[in-house]
Design a protein with these regions (language model features):
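Short solvent-exposed loop/turn micro-motifs enriched in small/polar/acidic residues
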Residues: 91-93, 199-202
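Extended active-site and interfacial segments that coordinate phosphate-rich ligands
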Residues: 93-139
């Protein structure tokens, strides 16, 4: 069993709460992850906490004391339980990820991951600015297919894109032969298809501001 530690980071007064603080934490986490091979950060956010492990659902509350505290409160909780089918099970690969839970396999994963990595030379973000190089590579190819999609969504959101838009781009509805779409919807999907290949049903949530 891994050694599990929990820490709390105080928000600097000059940093706004919410996504601005989370963006700083994202950069800190990526720098730490790349400096320590045998560690995994389940979550580092001012708005969400991810509890994960190789458990049955009813064992989760027994393992983490936080979840037994009657004063512990949350607006929403996502729970996922499924054994690995195409990767070896491990604590860090357990769901939830930081943005999504996903029940299934992404058949296009290798192509999606390779193309995300290939784009890194031309990536830029007005929100990450000169910190962008610290979070590369965007996709950790050692993770599961779901984790790699989670990496991509997290990067898009931290770069300033609203989560619903990021999801519509990465996981578009079947639009090519859909005659019910109006021209604006068709133009939307066609435009973003030039920038992002579709990933394969997902459950995701955006934390409260």
């Amino acid at each position: 069993m891994p050694c599990i530690m929990q820490g709390f980071i105080e928000r600097p007064k000059k940093v706004e709460q919410g996504i601005d603080f989370d963006r700083k934490l994202y950069i800190v986490r990526r720098v730490f992850e790349q400096s320590a091979d045998d560690t995994y950060v389940a979550s580092l956010s001012s708005r969400t906490i991810a509890y994960k492990g190789m458990f049955l659902v009813d064992q989760l509350r027994l393992f983490f004391p936080d979840l037994q505290d009657p004063d512990y409160d949350s607006a929403i909780a996502l729970v996922h339980s499924r054994f690995s089918t195409n990767t070896n099970p491990s604590w860090e690969r357990a769901h939830p990820n930081r943005f999504i839970v996903h029940n299934g396999e992404i058949n296009t994963i290798r192509g999606n991951a390779d193309k995300m990595l290939a784009r890194e030379e031309t990536m830029e973000s007005s929100h990450l600015k000169n910190q962008l190089h610290k979070i590369l590579p965007v996709v950790d190819t050692r993770g599961s297919d779901s984790a790699m999609l989670d990496n991509t969504l997290e990067f898009l959101v931290m770069s300033g894109m609203p989560l619903p838009l990021a999801v519509m781009i990465t996981i578009p509805e079947p639009w090519t032969n859909n005659k019910t779409l109006d021209q604006d919807e068709r133009d939307f999907y066609q435009y973003y298809a030039t920038m992002m290949e579709p990933w394969d049903c997902l459950l995701y949530t955006s934390p409260s501001p």
